[in-house]
Regions:
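Catalytic glycan-binding domains that act on GlcNAc-containing polysaccharides
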Residues: 1-155
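Low-complexity, Gly/Ser/Thr/Pro-rich intrinsically disordered linker/tail segments
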Residues: 153-166
């Protein structure tokens, strides 16, 4: 995962710890994560709350926009490399559209959850639970940044080096 995350950092200018923290919050790093099924009368399934899917929990419409803009026609939401590239694109676009620093995990998460328009309108301000979740994402991002700083030199060497000398 480090190599894919490093490529995203280099391509989109996004620090590794921000999309990783958002991804943990959205899917707990599960490749096939989906929103829970909704039930009628407690036992009749009638679909999911949204089309979110995969590592990034990207909704179909937003994923399709990414595929077109980033020329990633073979990308898949359940592929880690593709999902983290999507997140890099999204975070980069959030900075461009809403002026949120790529390093600001708290407000990047609010952008990610509410969408660019929702963030711009301040829809999150009426959702105390979401602001609390964004604080958790920010705290986790800081933890991830510290962890990465302590081991990134080893990660850069690759798995074979770590196997024999790590």
């Amino acid at each position: 995962w480090y190599d894919a995350a490093a490529k995203v950092r280099d391509k989109w200018g996004v620090p590794i710890h921000v999309p990783m923290s958002i991804m943990y919050q959205e899917s707990s790093f599960k490749h096939n994560a989906r929103p829970p099924m909704r039930w009628f009368l407690g036992f009749i399934p009638y679909g999911r709350a949204s089309s979110a899917y995969g590592y990034s929990q990207a909704k179909t419409v937003t994923w399709d926009e990414y595929v077109k803009e980033a020329d990633r026609f073979w990308a898949s939401r359940d592929n880690f490399d593709d999902a983290i590239d999507f997140m890099g694109w999204y975070i980069s676009k959030s900075q461009r559209l809403n002026g949120v620093s790529k390093w600001d995990a708290h407000n990047q998460y609010l952008n990610y959850h509410e969408g660019w328009g929702g963030y711009k309108r301040g829809s999150y301000k009426k959702k105390a639970w979401l602001v609390q979740t964004a604080k958790k994402v920010d705290s986790r991002a800081k933890t991830y940044a510290a962890q990465l700083k302590s081991c990134e030199d080893d990660l850069k060497r690759g798995w074979l080096w770590r196997l024999f000398f790590g």
